[in-house]
Amino acid sequence: MPSTLYPVRIDRRVFVTMSDGVRLGLTTYLPDASGKGPYPAVIESLPYRKDDDCYTRDWQTYAYLAQRGIAGVRVDIRGTGASGGVINDEYSPQEIADTCEVLAWVAEQEWCSGDLGMWGISWGGFSALQTAMLRPPGLKAIVAAHATHDRFASDVHYVGGSLHAAEQGDWPVSMIALNGLPPDPDIVGEGWFEMWIDRLESTPQWLPRWLRHQSRDDYWLHGSPCADYGAIEAATLLIGGWLDGYVDGLLAMLEHLHCPRRAVIGPWGHHRPATGVPAPTYDHLELMARWFGHHLRGDDNGVMDLPLLTAWIRTAPPYDGDRCHGYWRAEPTWPPADRVIWERSLGRLEHRDSLTWHGPQWVGAHAPAWDRAGVGSRDPHADDANSMVFETLPLPDPLDILGLPEVEL
């Protein structure tokens, strides 16, 4: 890590032509330090527009890295923002192929050392994992936050195999609106109107395709790390939150990936850890700079001395406004070597072999929705009062529950 912070040079009007002639729009964030390069580079590929929707967020991320001698490249996916073409689906083979072409272009630039990383939160995290599965030349490290291992059973489509109805009425509809916005004429120049009309007329709705695939088939296995954990060789930093819908995937990847890896799980929802709700927050940019500094530049910064998993353990009472009570716990292995089977009697032997409870249909409707953590009540007592609940007497000693517990009744 450099001892001084470099000035940053930003260029929002960078374009790279794909092998089929479609032009993608990029923004580069470069260390402005004469004679100090070339630099490693970190790439992020998103459909969320780099020139307006995500500009402030991108600047915060890539200026931080560039000041520390790591170039940043932010890409608008084909058919979004400043990029031409049409986006036909999320995480399509075309999208990942485009990303590999962008990586190759970045590696050839005079300001780049050829040592590449990728990062992202949610879509960008998926993109980093899926690109790493193809092992493109030069890609040595990734950071994937709030991403999952299984596009079918652990994403926003069919959670556990059941249709995720709440997200299907929200997520794909919002993407129709976002994909329908015009490119910025000040960025793409002449031809912006024709790009926009083509986008409006040609971009399909995604939901019908998802509904045609209601079981784990090749459509969902594409881009799912669980289909081949061994395909990812790049050093992988995983970041998640206990109130996020993708934390199960983080734990599965931490256990099954073979590459150098570390993970952090905080109390947040689907947020950037540095501003996550509920607090405490976590400086993910500092950790990212260390991760990429070590794996792309060879910095001896101790990042691989961190425990395999650093996780926030909630304690009672768990929440105080927007703050979560608890402490950080370090695990050198995953699953934990000291895990035990915990046996407690919840009742007595009875002749009945089943229990039935017909509760009101609104149970659970007032709890915070997935991807909306930090909004609404976190007190489960009203739902408990209208549900079938199995509970013990007060425990005699503290008990940490960490990971994916299995309960046998």
Question: Where does each model-flagged region fall?
Answer:
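Accessory cap/linker subdomain of secreted extracellular hydrolases
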Residues: W59, Q67, M133-A231
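N-terminal cap/lid segment of alpha/beta-hydrolase-fold proteins
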Residues: M1-G37, L395-D397
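Short glycine-enriched nucleophile-adjacent loop
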Residues: G125-P136, M253
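Short beta-strand/loop motif that positions the catalytic acidic residue
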Residues: I232, L238-G240
